[in-house]
């Protein structure tokens, strides 16, 4: 059993979880965001998005100054008060976006895999794909340690592509709508564990953790949480955890921010 009282950390995915997958609306979650803010409970955003995108959204959601996890864990944006930590303001895991792009271009040219990366198109095209404004779409291209792409080949070729990436120390990860390539050592779980350890070091006590997500790439994050909310999502693969004890895992009936609210209601309102 746990409560909204400190120490508590809430880790949340964005698209399809805190934000509606299509409209990007988050208002159903607003009352809980306000309540958590008033209780001084950090809400740490975790996403495949770039840090530039997430800093914009963090401000919109009233969460500015808190740490966040970008690019599926390849980038950690540090909290404003963590200026003494090496690497401030961001810690980047593994190889850079530019190096990954070079690998992908080589694989495409020499082994003829079919895919389109965000680097291949302009912000107008990304805006069309995502429903974002052009200014917001431009932020999606500011990757530091990953590449986002649309797969345009067969499942058989995908298996071959994944194997080639693994040989090169990279991983191929499915998000809510797109695929992502990043260093094999990076992950939302690794980044979350680092943030949890930092809060523990600063406060002297390990915080209780609650995570919320809707896609396969959220599973590693939810596995390392004390409690998890699996928000009903659009992804056909869904989210499957090794430990789905009902005492610690809740699957919502609603999607997006309404599911986010449902998950918080389940774990806190009854306590």
UniProtKB/Swiss-Prot annotation:
The yes or no answer to whether the keyword Transcription is present is: no
Q: Which domain of life is it from?
A: Bacteria
Question: What's one Pfam family here?
Answer: Hydrolase_3
What's in the GO CC field?
Answer: cytosol
Question: Which keywords has UniProt assigned to this entry?
Answer: Cytoplasm, Hydrolase, Magnesium, Metal-binding
User: Where located?
Assistant: Cytoplasm
Q: Does the keyword Chaperone apply?
A: no
E.C. numbers: 3.1.3.70
Cite the active-site annotation: 13 (nucleophile)
Q: Which Gene3D superfamilies match?
A: HAD superfamily/HAD-like, Putative mannosyl-3-phosphoglycerate phosphatase, domain 2
**Residue sites binding Mg(2+) per the record:** 13, 15, 214
| HAMAP family, per the entry | MPGP_rel
Q: What family is reported?
A: Belongs to the HAD-like hydrolase superfamily. MPGP family.
**This protein is called what?**
Mannosyl-3-phosphoglycerate phosphatase
